[in-house]
Structure formats: structure tokens, C-alpha cells
Amino acid sequence: MIPKTLHIIWVGDDRKRPDNCIQTWVDHNPDWTVQLWGNDDLSAMGWYNARHIQAMGQRELNGVADLMRWEILYNEGGFVVDADSECVRGLDDWLLEHEAFACWENELDRPRLIAAGYVACEAGNPFIGQII
């Protein structure tokens, strides 16, 4: 079963962190644990892809968050959402009854593309392990 934990990652300039968006996840999901990952976690964690994270940090912070998300999901389980996304209603408990789930990107603009900003799994999920 997927744990009721929302993981939200923001690396870079904390003054630009979309706290208004993050708060929508907190407000609509009061019975979930919300874990905000940030700049301090880059050095505090023993990342498997630390070398890639460091190299990516020189070019694109979105890529750093992408690399972090897979390791967080694999190690902790839960649901990772993009920090700049808004939650408009609470998440349904039936989603948690599965080993993993993901959402499609915009089907009109990007058909059959899985949205990396909305992925969930149990800790140790082998598919997520293969991504890492």
C-alpha cells in the first residue's frame, strides 16, 4: 500500500518557491503527511545519483528535482507532485491500494506521455528502482 505522504521538491532560490501552490496540497489533504524537500537535502542525503545531481545543478534545477524524486519515491514511498502544481480537491484513498500509479501529461499536447510530476509508489518499487 502506498503511504499517505506527499513529497514536494523545491531546489534553487527559496524566494521563488511557490508556497501558494504547495499550500493547496496541504489544505486539500489534511490527513496526509507533507514532506518538503529542498536545498539542504541536497547535501544532507546520500543520493545514489549524487554525481549526476551535482552536474545537473550547474545547468537545470528542474533536472535536479527529477533525479531527487525517483530516489525519494524508491526510499520512502508516497506521492511526488510538482511544487508549482495546484491541488483542487483531496486525493482519493483508493489510489493508495495499488503498488504504484502515475498520471498522463496533457493528452492533447503530449499524448501518451507519463507526467513525472504526479507519480506514486510503495517504497522499494522495482520499476522506480530501474529508473534510478
Task: Describe the function of each predicted region.
Residues 1-49, 123-126:
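N-terminal anchoring/stem segment of glycosyltransferases
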Residues 23, 53-54, 92, 128-132:
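Generic detector of well-ordered alpha-helical segments enriched in charged/polar residues
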Residues 33-71:
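Active-site-proximal specificity loops/subdomain of glycosyltransferases
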